[in-house]
Amino acid sequence: MPTDKEIKKDFKLKASQNPDEYYATAALKREGFSRRKCKRCSTYFWNTTGNEFCGDPACSGGFRFIGNTPATNKLDYVGVWKKFAELFSKWGYTPIERYPVVARWRDDTDFVQASIYDFQPYVVSGEVAPPANPLVVPQPCLRFNDIDNIGITGAHYSCFIMIGQHAFLPPEQWSQERFFTDIHNWLKQGLGLKNEEITFHEDAWAGGGNFGPCMEYFSRGLELGNQVYMLYEVTPSGNKELNLKVLDMGMGHERNAWFSQGKSTSYETTFPTVVDFLKKQTGAHVDQTLMQKFLPYASYLNVDEVEDINQTWKDVAAKVGVSVEELRKCVSESAALYSIAEHSRALLFALADGGMPSNVGGGYNLRVLYRRALSLMDTHKWEVEMNTIAKRHAEYLKHIFPELYRNLEQVHRILDVEKAKYEASKQKTKSIIAKMLNEDVTDEKLLILYDSQGIAPELLAQEAAAVGKKITVPENFYARVSALHEKNRQEHATKKEEKLPLDGIPDTEALYFGDYLLIENEG
């Protein structure tokens, strides 16, 4: 079976050769958009300005909305969902409550990673009716491949809210043009953008066993969302057309709030009360003037996309007009503060929904987040309780996700146990350092120590420095840790068992849909 990456590449080429069949080109043309091919990356895109470069920050010149957003509607983080739900309700969509971020209804993933996960595979295949049709949902998602970028690029998260716009319709009721127009109207009416500030990219998407064409939308270097039109599913016997055409629009809640306010970093708009609290408690100073100069180029420091990260730091420092050392010092402290805010919210969602840190599966990644946050506190000698931070998040999000506040006691108990385990691991560090004084500490050794004994590399480097030994932690350390524990079970996404003759037998009622904490039933 081909990988998602291979499926996407092949289908993108096919769609680019016949855009009128796969994209809402008639609607784009009516609005004055024209199709172009990016001079830098060769992506096909649509704009109204004649600009020959696509909307991607690497091609268009970084983030250009910071301190100068073209959005005329200024929305705070909570206000983004409220405005979105209000407009889409008027346009015939039903706003529904989020699903748990712990994906117990699926056997191919531990956590929800996109809003469409709520409905795969059985709603997408037409075997189960959706809770509403069409619908919108503010869905928390967990992904662990960008941990090293959090706090640095200004836009990366392990936990983010994907605002989903979804529909599951037979061919005779499908209107791709209508769905595209609705999201275009969000950009114009919700954010208050003019067409000349919007760039649409032709692309393809594959994931969860499904694939199809998609339209990404950008403004001033920032991708705001991506509207996918699912046409096919991947099966062991080959690609198959879906019985239902599926709309899968995923929009970054955090990015839309950030863009709307035009602040130096999205973390300031996503966790406003928590960031203010952490600054006061830690005494950390975020140089907003320097950060405002840095953030337009921060996207260049994505460790997954850069071959020589040290050279990239030098290039960015030159653009900002400061030394590499000064830039790294400033960004390091702010990145630590923002990472603690981000990791604590991710843990709040996961633990409130029944997740549990452990040494296996998805629980391993939760433990990675918690220990990284505590390690950053140790490195900067900050004393803040994670329980207190989690409570601040829950209070701020109460108007969208009241269940987080209700489940705080459960979250606090788990965090207390994990902290005790972390403190125990710290005691091992000094004895290990003593044994390693005369050894080369390779990246592989750091990974083994973290994976087998839970010893954070930052803590190891700090203890080593105290005895005159230098240990360098790789920039992509946590991505490599997560990769060690990744599962590749793509076949499960749409593969279903052979149907049995069950005529006359009453339907089974899935009780866990009504209570996600219910894990044992009789039938």
Segment roles from a protein language model:
Residues 2-12:
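N-terminal alpha-helical interaction blocks
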